[in-house]
Amino acid sequence: VEMAAAAGLRLVPAGMRDPGATTTTGVGELISVALDGGARRIIIGCGDSGTCDGGAGALVALGARLLDADGHEVDPIGSNLARVRRIETSGMDPRLRDVEVLVAGNMHNLLTGERGVSRVFGPQKGASPEQVEALEAGLVHWAELLAEAFPAQAAHRDLLTGPGTGASGGLGAGLAAGLGARLCSRFDVLM
C-alpha cells in the first residue's frame, strides 16, 4: 500500500493544501482491500503524504470510531484530534489480528517535538505557524488516546518521539499502536 497514492501531497493542488483537513482514510481502505484479497503481510510505503492526522483516518476505515466528550463521532482529520476524547475499538476488523503490518518510512520522522511531523512537514503541507502548533498539540493528545485504546501494542513504544512514529503525518504512530505494526526503514524492507 503506497501512502502517496492514497493520501499524497501531490493529490492536493498547491493552493488548497491544508494538513488539518486531510485524512489517511484511503490508506485504511487499501489495507481493507488487501485483507479482502487474503493478504497475510501488508507493507505500507510511507512518504510524500498530505496528511497530519496521526493515522486516525486509517484506523477509522478499519473500524475504529473517534468520539468527542458527548459521545458523538468526530471526523478523522488532523484539526479534530484535540476534540477526540476516546477511541472506540470494538468495531475494528478482526482480520487485523492475523496479519503482519510493516510501515516502511523514514525512521528519523518523529510524531511530536522540534523534529515532529507538524513542525518539520506542516509548512510544506500548507500549515500556517498557528496551525503547526495546533496540529502539534492534537498529535500529543492523540498519542495519549492511542496508548489508552491500544495498551498492549502501545506499551512498549514511545509514540511521541519514537523513530518512525511521524512517518506520513503520524501514520506510523497510529498503525504501530492500532495494528501493532512494525516501523522500519524503506531500505530494510527492500533488503
Predicted regions located by residue number:
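N-terminal loops that bind phosphate or other acidic moieties
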Residues: 1-46, 50-191
